[in-house]
Amino acid sequence: MSRYRADIAILGACALHAELGLSASQEADADVKRAMLAASAEHWLVADHTKVNHCEPWLVAGLSDIHHLFLDRPWPELGDDPALSVHIADA
């Protein structure tokens, strides 16, 4: 994947934790997500409420590495990070 370059990486979350960040349930999935983040300028993450406040065994990235976070509900535990743009989908 190092031969490729992308403007935006849009990732789906396996698990998302306010302190631990993005994690994956499978090592190969975590490796691909890390490579996509390394090869892109913008990092977008999509997650629904079933993924937040969870952690899987394979850490991918901290929330500080994500530029835009798209959720289906507000996430009170997230706190306030001015570098992270949080978008809540309208139902």
Q: Where are the model-predicted features located?
A:
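Conserved phosphate- and dinucleotide-binding cores of soluble alpha/beta proteins
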Residues: 1-91
